[in-house]
Amino acid sequence: MKRMVYLVACLPFWLTSCEEKVTALHFNEAEQVFEIGKESELRFLNETFEIKDKNMEAQTLLTDAGKEIPADEVRIKLVKDIEISGEWTPIKFPVREFDGNGHTITFDGIRVVIEESSKGVFDVGLFEEMGGEKEAVVKDLTLAGDMTIDAQKREDGYSLLAGSLAGEFKNGCIENCTSKVDISFADNKGICTLCPGGLVGDLDSYGSEVEVALRGKIINEGNLTVNPCSDAYIGGVIGRATNYGKIFIKENVCVENKGDLTVQWKADAQPDHSYIGGVVGLFKTNETDIEHLHNWGNIRLDTQNTSATFNIGGVCGELTPHNYERIYPLDLYNAGNIEIKHDLLAEFSAIGGVIGSFGGSSFHQVVNEGKIIVSGKGCKYISGLLGSESSIHGNCYLYSCCVDKVGAYPVWNISYHPVTKQVPCKENHPTNQK
C-alpha cells in the first residue's frame, strides 16, 4: 500500500520530467499553420532562434514532417489554453501571424530578469518584438495572469519597452486581443527609460509608407505598477505610439483600458518630460483619424516632489501630430480618476481629464467623467478635457459635442494659437461607449 501511495504521489513529477522534448511543431497542411498547445512548444520558438545564431534572415521553423518554413511565412495557431510559469525569455522568433483562436495564454507569476551584464535596450512581453519590414498579424488572443520585470541587479542606465503581448509592435495588425495581465516593474534605482503598456510597449510603423492597424476589440484589464521611475511613457494599453507612417484606429474598433496605473517617481529625477495616459502614454502620428479610445482605469502618480514635467491624460498623456499635419480624434472617453500625490513642481506640467498635452487636432465627442484629484501643489495647466496646448503644432478646434461632465476645471488651456477655438458641432455621431 505504501508503495502504491508513493507511485501516485510521484506520478505528476514523472509525467512532467518524462515529457518528450520538442524538436518540431505540428504543421496543419490543410490550413498551412503550425499548431501550438503547450508551454514547451512556445519555448521551442526561442530554442529554434538560438540554434540559428540569431540571424533573422536565416530563420526557419521545422515542421513535424521535416519541412522548413521560412520565418516570414510562419503562421501559428493556438489549439489549447496554455499556462507559462517560472522565468520567461520573450520570444524572439519572428512570425507572420499569431492566431489565438479564442484561447488564453496565462502567465503564472512569470519573471523577466534584466541582468547587469546584458545589453542596454530590452523588449519584454510574450514576444520581444513583432512586425518589422514584414508585417505581422495577431488576432483572437487573450493574455492573463501576472508578470514581474525585475531589474534590481542593474546598475547602468538602460531602456525598456514592455507589454503583455510584445515590447514593440512595428508593422501589421492587432485584432480582437485582450490582456488581463498584471504587470509590475521595479529597479530600485530609477535609471530606466521606460515604455510600458498593458498590451504593447511601443506601437510603431517601420517606415513612412507602412501602416499599423488596430481592429475589433482591443482591451486591457490588467493593472500596471511602476516603482520607481524617472523617464517614462506609460499607457494602459500602449505605452507609446509614435511614427512617421500611419496608425489606423478608426471605424469598427474600440480600444479600452479597464486597469489601474500606479506610478511612483524617483525623488531626484531629472526635469525631463514624461507621459502617462489611461490608454496611450504618448501618441504622436501623421495625419489620420483616431477613433474610439476609452478609459475606465484610475491613474495614481506619486511625484515625490520631483522637478520632472508630466503630461497626464485620462486617455492620452500627449496627442499631437508629427510636423504640422493634422489629426482628427473622435469618441475619446474617460471615466477613470487621476490622482496626484505630492507637488507638481515643473511649470509646464499638463493634466487633462482626457488629454494632457495636445496640438494640431480637431476634436469631436471628447467626454470626461473622471475626477482630477491633486493632494499637493498643483500646476496652472489642469483642465477638465485638454490640459495644455502645444506651442509647435498648429491650431485646434474643440467642437461642442465635447463635454467635461465633472466641471471642476476649465475644459482646456489655450495660449499659443489665436485661431484655436471652440465651435458648434452639427454631426450626429455614433458611439462605441458602453
Which sequence ranges carry the predicted segments?
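Surface-exposed repetitive/solenoidal architectures
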Residues: E19-K434
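C-terminal motif of bacterial Sec signal peptides marking the signal peptidase cleavage site
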Residues: L15-S17
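Sec-dependent signal peptide recognition
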Residues: K2-V8
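Repetitive helical segments and hydrophobic/amphipathic motifs
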Residues: L11-P12
